[in-house]
């Protein structure tokens, strides 16, 4: 596939880009189209047909809305930033070998790697859930605006991520508008999946380094209960992770092998 003009990791960190509700089934369909060996043009046409009656407004939906939805799906699974190609390829391989109910883990990882804004929103959601057991769209919008600026696009993107997480079953609406509680939670025990998810998160932080213990307790990974493993196990399970220590029990991970 051609990758000319793709965003580098540096540029995408300042961008928002996530301006639409993205349903889990749409990501699954997109990944399956890539796994089946379709070229970019065929995938684009297939997504146009697939989304024809699935966006709000049905056949009357504005073309721009569908185009933006497809652009998000393509950036995650079809044409990711060039530094995420290996991550994407490994993610597709893992999808083909793990149970369907665990696919959500891989879709989460690729989404946050392609859209660091998603991870920033998830971090504030996770923090609120830990502190008070609920999370508020308004509170997260205010926190994110402090980081990305007071822009309408920021508030809209936060809202769309909340709606997406609710669609994925990871948040549940309450009787109070804009207030959510935790939804589904997933235990991750497969070392391949853990290593891949750690790598995805390191891409959010421009390759690391990050302390291993901190990664396992990240609020931005709030839907997942990651089985603690050693840095050595992660490095062995990954083609691209590397580790170093600065003291007893202070292991750091970095994307440091051939990428």
Residue ranges with predicted function:
Residues 2-112, 123-124, 135:
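Eukaryotic partner-binding/assembly regions in large regulatory complexes
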Residues 53-61, 142-153, 214-228:
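Short helix-coil junctions and helix-kink-helix linkers
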Residues 122-133, 137-185:
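Eukaryote-skewed repeat-based solenoidal scaffolds used as protein-protein interaction platforms
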Residues 26-34, 38, 108-134, 189-210, ...:
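Positively charged, polyanion-binding regions of nucleic-acid-associated proteins
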Residues 42-48, 131-146, 206-219:
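Short acidic, hydrophobic short linear motifs in intrinsically disordered regions
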Residues 174-254:
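Accessory, usually C-terminal, subdomains that scaffold auxiliary metal cofactors
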């Amino acid at each position: 596939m051609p990758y000319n003009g793709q965003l580098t990791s540096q540029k995408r960190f300042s961008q928002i880009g996530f301006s639409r509700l993205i349903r889990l089934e749409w990501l699954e369909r997109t990944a399956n189209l890539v796994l089946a060996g379709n070229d970019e043009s065929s995938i684009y046409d297939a997504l146009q047909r697939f989304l024809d009656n699935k966006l709000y407004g049905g056949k009357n939906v504005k073309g721009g809305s569908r185009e933006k939805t497809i652009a998000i799906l393509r950036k995650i699974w079809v044409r990711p930033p060039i530094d995420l190609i290996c991550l994407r390829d490994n993610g597709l391989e893992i999808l083909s070998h793990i149970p369907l109910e665990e696919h959500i883990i891989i879709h989460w990882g690729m989404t946050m790697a392609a859209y660091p804004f998603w991870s920033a929103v998830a971090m504030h959601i996770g923090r609120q859930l830990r502190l008070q057991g609920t999370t508020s769209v308004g509170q997260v919008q205010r926190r994110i605006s402090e980081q990305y600026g007071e822009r309408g696009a920021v508030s809209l993107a936060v809202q769309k991520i909340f709606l997406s997480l609710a669609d994925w079953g990871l948040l549940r609406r309450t009787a109070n508008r804009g207030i959510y509680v935790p939804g589904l939670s997933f235990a991750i025990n497969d070392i391949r999946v853990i290593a891949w998810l750690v790598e995805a998160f390191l891409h959010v932080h421009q390759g690391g380094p990050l302390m291993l213990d901190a990664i396992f307790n990240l609020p931005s990974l709030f839907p997942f209960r990651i089985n603690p493993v050693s840095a050595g196990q992660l490095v062995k399970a990954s083609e691209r992770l590397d580790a170093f220590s600065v003291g007893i029990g202070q292991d750091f991970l970095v994307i440091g092998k051939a990428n």
